[in-house]
Amino acid sequence: KVKKIMSSGAEESASEKKDPEITPGGSTVYRYEDQSEDNDPKNLFPEIQCVYLDEIEEHLTKYIAEPDMVFHEIVSELVHIDVHWIKPSANYPYHILVTSGMSDLPMQVPDEVENKETYERAELMVVLPADWKIGEEEFQDDNNYWPVYFLKRLARFPHEYKTWLGYGHTIPNGMEAEDIANTGFGCMLLLPPMLSFDEDFLELKTKDGNIINFYAMIPVYR
């Protein structure tokens, strides 16, 4: 079961201008509301697609392995999100799923962030157990599909709400951080995948001079 999401640690959206909430631990919480149908960016088709697709594939091949398959999106809103699948191997005994397309457009990073331009583009990834069921048929079951759903949902999130996602941001599954599918997880935490992959993998410098940061999507309990 997947709910509308809100972000902790992200900039406020254009549709929500209230003062942010502060948790007892000092974290900032921003809530995002649906926009009117006329202004809803979800109704916009991508103006550009697959800007860095080839460079991302080359980056994955260089530092991890060549993707075994790409789950191509048929119908896209805002940005075209594909998911690259690297199957388990001796070096990496787990499934690796990585987005491409989130970085097609820059995110709206707050001006107070130092070197903000280096955080404007990102892609997301998740690592799954070797016995995880992956495939078009298997994804008909939400218990198998939810990691891919959240990769794609979060990849669109900053573009939909004119905000950004980055290091340490947490995104709950709805206002109450409800359980996701058949798990006890209720939130997603974004961190650089530095424990699983080479440090040089964490950042891709594109041919046009931009920087794409890779963040691991880590499910956490409420």
Please name every model-derived segment.
Residues 2-222:
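Short linear motifs embedded in intrinsically disordered, proline/glycine-rich low-complexity segments
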